[in-house]
Amino acid sequence: MANLKSLPVGDKAPEVVHMVIEVPRGSGNKYEYDPDLGAIKLDRVLPGAQFYPGDYGFIPSTLAEDGDPLDGLVLSTYPLLPGVVVEVRVVGLLLMEDEKGGDAKVIGVVAEDQRLDHIQDIGDVPEGVKQEIQHFFETYKALEAKKGKWVKVTGWRDRKAALEEVRACIARYKG
């Protein structure tokens, strides 16, 4: 089986990228791709009454500041399955820090979903949806503080900043 982390980033990158889905929208389970197993495995069950507000995964052939592929949250009409590779239109960036350092999340939409064609930049995402995303990431590790886990959201950035982050992570991956 191919290493999902090294799949192509996509021919239209950085505007449209491939994203490997690890966690479907609505899940209270945190799944992660394990390249040693060649499979997506359960990392943990979120300890609170929380669920992912979008489909969560990573952009292959990228390297973020934390040493992992660049994370992303995808807005979709219907939940996507773990292991699916989806073309995602990059629309914004959520800047965060956690116990490991910088941990930005690309925000995107399914590129081939006409219901989402109107979302081109983070300003097009309804305010309530952005608040839900921010609240999730601010609190999803709160009950794990005794284990040294924490998160701080430092702000939202527009599509231009998100594209710059994707470019930087592609360049870092290439070395």
From Swiss-Prot:
Protein known as: Inorganic pyrophosphatase
Enzymatic reactions: diphosphate + H2O = 2 phosphate + H(+)
Similarity annotation: Belongs to the PPase family.
Catalytic activity, EC: 3.6.1.1
Cofactor: Mg(2+)
Binding site for Mg(2+) 1: 66, 71, 103
A GO cellular-component term linked to this record: cytoplasm
Domain of life of the organism encoding this protein: Bacteria
Pfam family, one: Pyrophosphatase
Record has Transmembrane as a keyword: no
Organism of provenance: Thermus thermophilus (strain ATCC 27634 / DSM 579 / HB8)
